[in-house]
Amino acid sequence: MSDRLPMETTYLVHDALRRELRQLAAVATRGDGTLRGVLRGAAGWKLLRRALRVHHGAEDAALWPVLRHALAGRPYDLALLEAMEAEHTAIGSLIGAVDEALAEPSTDPVLLGDLVDALVTGVGGHLRHEEESTFPLVQAVVTAQQWERFQQVHARRIAADADRLLPWLLDGADERTATAVLAPLPAPVRRAYRERWRPAYAALDRWGPGTPVPAPAPTPVPTPTPAQAPT
């Protein structure tokens, strides 16, 4: 049976996060002592950090409360939701710890490497946990209107950084997926994506010298409305 709710873009966000986690892990395992120097100026770290905060913030604000109400009287499922919330908190704390370590010149490189490893492992495990355990609950109890509301909240949070997060999201996406994401957006936004945002993103060496950068998918503009912006 097919899913009731359209979650393709949510999976696309997860895939993009996994792509960046692989890049972050590659930087951390180079073993040449450059981790702090690379991450301090890495656009990839800033994009990963921002994408996690946008995505998790939208879930905390507009998805978990809906699930908590719908799952009242189901202690096992509520315990799963509490685990999701705890994982978000832990990931946020790890991001903060990495940033603090990057800001301190005397940070032990081993400590920084351990923090990055914990973040890569923690986010990867959270994405898997969410897809395997929480998404089926979302499909079972969240209404189409509630899901649309979550998408709108997510859209508002991403809109301010659409010039970077949209090409980041579509990096490596196939043509069908990219077309589906872009089609609902206003024409000026699609044009800005094609003519400015995607070329600027493609020119970034997101993770610094010596780190492979995935090939990207082959001034102000109107901000997309919440219903139109990607989730």
Which stretches of residues belong to each language-model region?
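Small-residue-biased structural context
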Residues: 1-231
